[in-house]
A protein has these predicted regions:
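Membrane-water interface regions at transmembrane-helix termini and the short interhelical loops
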Residues: 34-38, 85-101, 135, 150-174, ...
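Hydrophobic alpha-helical segments of multi-pass membrane transport proteins
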Residues: 320-326, 347-365, 380-414
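Membrane-embedded translocation segments of transport machinery
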Residues: 2-8, 168, 172-321, 345-346
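Transmembrane helix-boundary motif of multi-pass solute transporters/channels
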Residues: 10-48, 237, 248-251, 255-258, ...
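Inter-helical loop and helix-membrane interface segments of multi-pass membrane transporters/permeases
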Residues: 2-7, 33-38, 68, 73-92, ...
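A generic transmembrane alpha-helix motif of multi-pass inner-membrane proteins
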Residues: 377-401, 422-452
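Hydrophobic, membrane-embedded alpha-helices of multi-pass small-molecule transporters
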Residues: 9, 16-26, 97-101, 105, ...
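Membrane-interface "cap" regions at the ends of multi-pass membrane proteins
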Residues: 1-29, 56-63, 67-80, 84-91, ...
C-alpha cells in the first residue's frame, strides 16, 4: 500500500510536539530534587554541559535517521542502514516505546485521579491521611485501571486524527496550557513566606557537593529527560520537512525541556520550604508530599490552595498526556506502515496492547502483588528493563550506527540540509557521536547497575 508521507504543517507545531514528547513527569518529580541535592546552580551548569555534549548530539542523530528514513523507527533504521541488521535497533526503539506507554499510563492515570480528587477537595489532610489515600487508591483493582484507560483513550483520540489534525493541533493547545499553568503556580509559590529558602535550595551553587555521583546523575538526567532511544524522537523526525534545521530544533527542544524542569523546581521548593518540608523525589513527592505542602502553604487562603492543587495535577496530567501521545505514535506508525493497515487500526492495536500492559502493571501493585519476577512487581520489571537496559543499549547502538556505519556524506547532507546550512559544527557533532556519546552512555548504563 503506497501512501504519501504525512508531515508537520508548521515549525512551531513541530517544535511543540517534539518538546511535548520530551517534557514529562520526570521534569517535575526528579530534576528539581537532583538540582537541590547536588549543588544547586553547580548541578545545573554540569547538566547543561551534559545536554550539549550528550543530549543534543543523540537527539540530532535520531533526527537524521528519522528524517532520512521517512518511516517508522524500525523501517527508518533499515532505510538508512540499507537493510542491514541495524534495523533491529529500530525495532528495539519501537518495543521500548510501546512497553513504556503501558506502565507510564498507570502513573499518568494517577495524575488524572488526583485532578478529580483535588476538584472535590479530597486531598485535604495531614501527610498520613494523604499517604493512606494514595495507598488505598493505587492498590485498588478498579479505580487506577479506569483512569489509565481514560488517559490512553485521550491519547488514542489524538493519534487517530493524524499528524497535523491530531498531534500538531493538540500540541499547540496542550503545551501553551502547560506553560501557563506552570507560570501561574510559580508566581503563587514564590509569593509565600520564606519562599527565598526554596529558591536558594534550588539555585545557590554549592561546589562542595560536586563529585562523581553528581556528574553521573547529570549525565543520566540529560539522556533520559530528552526521551532518547524511546522511538518518539526518530518517529517525529520522520514527519520533518527537508528545510528543518535539525541542530537548531534540537537546541530549542532541549531549552524548552530544561526550562520546564527548572520552573517545576520554582513551583515546588518555595512552597515546600515555606512550611518547613524538605521534599523527596519521585512519585512520593508528587502523590504523598505535595498535597500536604499545598494544604499547609495556603492554609490561610483555602480557595487559592484548592486552585493551586487542582492546577498542579492538571499540569501533571498535561505533561503525562503529551508524552503518552508521542510514545503511542511510535507503535502506531510501526503497525500501520508495516502491516499496511489504516492509521486507526494501527492505533487500535497499540491502545489495546498498552492497555493490557497497563492493567497488568496496575494490578501488580495491589491485587496481584504476589506475582513477582526476581522479587520485583511487574510494574518495576517493566520500568527496570526499559529504563535501565533497553534505553541505554538503544542509545549506545544508535550512536555507533550513525557515527561509524552510516555514510559520512549522508550524515553531513542531513546535518547541513544538503549544503544550505553551515557545516562548521559538523566535525564537532561527528566527534561527539563517535567517541563521547557512546562512552557517556556506557557510564550511565554501568552506574545504574552499580558497576561504577
Amino acid at each position: 500500500m503506497s501512501r504519501e508521507r504525512a508531515s508537520f504543517g508548521s515549525k512551531i507545531g513541530m517544535i511543540l510536539a517534539t518538546a511535548g514528547g520530551a517534557v514529562g513527569l520526570g521534569n517535575v518529580w526528579r530534576f528539581p530534587y537532583m538540582v537541590g541535592q547536588n549543588g544547586g546552580a553547580a548541578f545545573i551548569i554540569v547538566y547543561v554541559a551534559c545536554v550539549l555534549l550528550l543530549g543534543i548530539p543523540c537527539m540530532v542523530s535520531e533526527f537524521i535517521i528519522g528524517r532520512h528514513g521517512a518511516a517508522n523507527t524500525y523501517r527508518a533504521y533499515s532505510e538508512v542502514g540499507n537493510g542491514r541488521p541495524w534495523k533491529f535497533v529500530g525495532f528495539l526503539g519501537v518495543m521500548t516505546g510501546v512497553l513504556i506507554t503501558g506502565y507510564y499510563a498507570v502513573v499518568s492515570g494517577w495524575c488524572l485521579q488526583y485532578v478529580y480528587a483535588s476538584a472535590l477537595g479530597q486531598l485535604r489532610g495531614e501527610t498520613s491521611f494523604v499517604k493512606s489515600y494514595f495507598q488505598s487508591f493505587s492498590t485498588d483493582p478498579v479505580r487506577p485501571v479506569f483512569w489509565l484507560v481514560a488517559i490512553l483513550l485521550l491519547a488514542h483520540y489524538v493519534i487517530i486524527h493524524g499528524i497535523r489534525g491530531g498531534i500538531e493541533k493538540a500540541s499547540k493547545v496542550l503545551m501553551p496550557a502547560l506553560f501557563i499553568l506552570l507560570l501561574v503556580i510559580v508566581v503563587a509559590s514564590c509569593m509565600l513566606p520564606d519562599a527565598g529558602k526554596g529558591i536558594d535550595f534550588l539555585f545557590k551553587p554549592d561546589f562542595s557537593k560536586f563529585d562523581r555521583g553528581v556528574f553521573l546523575g547529570a549525565l543520566g538526567q540529560s539522556f533520559y529527560s530528552l526521551s532518547i532511544a524511546m522511538g518518539c524522537i526518530c518517529t517525529y523526525a520522520s514527519y520533518y520537512s527537508r528545510q528543518t534545521n535539525l541542530l537548531g530544533s534540537a537546541v530549542q527542544i532541549s531549552f524548552i525541556d530544561t526550562m520546564v524542569a527548572i520552573l517545576a523546581g520554582l513551583m515546588i521548593f518555595p512552597a515546600a520550604f515555606s512550611v518547613g518540608i524538605n521534599p523527596g523525589s519521585g512519585a512520593s513527592l508528587v502523590f504523598l508530599t505535595l498535597p500536604n505542602v499545598f494544604n499547609q502553604a495556603f492554609a490561610g487562603m483555602p480557595l487559592l490552595g484548592w486552585v493551586v492543587s487542582l492546577m498542579f495535577y492538571l499540569l501533571l496530567s498535561l505533561a503525562a498526556l503529551t508524552s503518552l501521545i508521542s510514545l503511542h505514535e511510535v507503535g502506531t506508525a510501526f503497525f500501520y506502515e508495516e502491516l499496511h493497515i489504516s492509521r486507526r487500526k494501527g492505533a487500535a492495536i497499540v491502545t489495546a496492547s498498552t492497555m493490557a500492559v497497563g492493567v497488568l502493571c496496575s494490578l501488580s501493585l495491589g491485587a496481584w502483588s504476589s506475582l513477582q519476577i526476581a522479587g520485583r512487581s511487574l510494574f518495576d520489571v517493566f520500568d527496570f528493563v526499559t529504563g535501565q537496559i533497553f534505553l541505554p543499549v538503544g542509545g549506545f547502538l544508535t550512536c555507533v550506527f550513525l557515527g561509524w556505519f552510516v555514510p559520512k556524506k549522508l550524515v553531513k547532507d542531513e546535518f547541513t540540509n544538503w549544503g544550505t546550512l553551515s557545516s562548521r559544527l559538523f566535525p564537532v557533532f561527528l566527534f561527539l557521536v563517535r567517541f563521547v556519546c557512546p562512552v557517556a552512555i556506557l557510564c550511565i548504563f554501568m552506574h545504574q547497575l552499580d558497576v561504577i
